[in-house]
Swiss-Prot record:
This is Ohanin. Neurotoxin that produces dose-dependent hypolocomotion and hyperalgesia in mice. May directly act on the central nervous system, as it is 6500-fold more potent when administered intracerebroventricularly than intraperitoneal. One of its GO terms (cellular component) is extracellular region. Gene3D superfamilies: 2.60.120.920. SMART domains: PRY. InterPro entries: B30.2/SPRY, B30.2/SPRY_sf, Butyrophylin_SPRY, ConA-like_dom_sf, PRY, SPRY_dom, TRIM/RBCC. It is found in: Secreted. Residues 128-190 form a propeptide. Residues 21-127 form the B30.2/SPRY domain. Keywords: Neurotoxin, Secreted, Signal, Toxin. It comes from Ophiophagus hannah.
């Protein structure tokens, strides 16, 4: 799937011509969840590879890094240049989003998951009951791959073969993996 996706990107960027190998030097990032940023109902596994929204506040201390009103968590490492990608496994639940956020993303108060808030994301939502979303849920768990071409200002999502590209202006800011995890949802970095 990854090779197909990278070749698809190459085809799009190369005027419709297929390439024999993946474009550029995409680096797979070994992403972990940053428990210091996790909303109070999110439980990060000891190896920092899985996160679950248990729906009940854990009584963790507040800090400037922690999301206070939205069930979100950031990941690491962060990126300031280059081409990187990471993969996330999701289950049959809906109400999650995966992507990237500026390191300075707002942590306190209501958070809108939009580029104006320094968040570039893709996910499955209860409020957007698209036929394709229902099809994904019936198949069970799946995978989303997030590609970042920092220097070109592109975030590319491959959600089980459905490719979406978002143009982004990072303004030189470090960007980090971003996750929104709804009630009773779990996600795993691969």
């Amino acid at each position: 799937m990854l090779l197909f996706t990278l070749c698809f990107f190459a085809d799009q960027e190369n005027g419709g011509k297929a390439l024999a190998s993946p474009p550029g030097n995409w680096q797979k990032a070994d992403v972990t969840f940053d428990s210091n940023t996790a909303f109070e109902s999110l439980v990060v596994s000891p190896d920092k590879k899985t996160v679950e929204n248990v729906g009940v506040p854990k009584g963790v201390p507040d800090s400037p890094e922690r999301f206070s009103s939205s069930p979100c968590v950031l990941g690491s490492p962060g990126f300031r240049s280059g081409k990187h990608f990471f993969e996330v496994k999701y289950g049959t639940q809906r109400e999650w989003a995966v992507g990237l956020a500026g390191k300075s993303v707002k942590r306190k108060g209501y958070l809108r998951l939009v580029p104006e808030e320094r968040i570039w994301q893709k996910g499955l939502w209860w409020l957007r009951r698209l036929e394709t979303d229902s099809d994904k849920l019936q198949k069970g768990s799946g995978k989303i791959i997030v590609f970042l071409d920092y220097d070109e200002g592109k975030v590319i999502f491959d959600l089980d073969g459905e490719v979406t590209t978002i143009q982004a202006n990072f303004n030189g800011e470090e960007v980090v993996p971003f996750y929104y995890i709804g009630a009773r949802v779990s996600l795993a970095n691969l």
